[in-house]
Curated annotation (Swiss-Prot):
Protein name: Transforming growth factor alpha
Subunit structure: Interacts with the PDZ domains of MAGI3, SDCBP and SNTA1. The interaction with SDCBP, is required for the targeting to the cell surface. In the endoplasmic reticulum, in its immature form (i.e. with a prosegment and lacking full N-glycosylation), interacts with CNIH. In the Golgi apparatus, may form a complex with CNIH and GORASP2.
Tissue and organ distribution: Gastric parietal cells.
Domain EGF-like residues, every copy: 4-44
Gene Ontology CC: extracellular space
Sorted UniProt keywords: Disulfide bond, EGF-like domain, Growth factor, Mitogen, Secreted
Biological role stated in the UniProt entry: TGF alpha is a mitogenic polypeptide that is able to bind to the EGF receptor/EGFR and to act synergistically with TGF beta to promote anchorage-independent cell proliferation in soft agar. Inhibitor of acid secretion. Inhibitor of aminopyrine uptake in parietal cells (in vitro).
Predominant cellular place of this UniProt entry's protein: secreted
GO molecular function annotation: epidermal growth factor receptor binding; growth factor activity
Subcellular location: Secreted, Extracellular space
Disulfide bonds: 8-21, 16-32, 34-43
Residues spanning the signal sequence: none
């Protein structure tokens, strides 16, 4: 089974402000899985509707 995500390298441990960093294998770039109540590419915004 091939995963689309890997753990982010150490160089990206602080990439996500309020979330977990995952590395997109096919796009070769980091992405964030935001904690509840946060949105944005790097989970940098509070979700005022949450």
């Amino acid at each position: 089974v091939v995963s689309h995500f890997n753990q982010c390298p150490d160089s990206h441990t602080q990439f996500c402000f309020h979330g977990t960093c995952r590395f997109l294998v096919q796009e070769d770039k980091p992405a964030c899985v935001c904690h509840s109540g946060y949105v944005g590419a790097r989970c940098e915004h509070a979700d005022l509707l949450a």
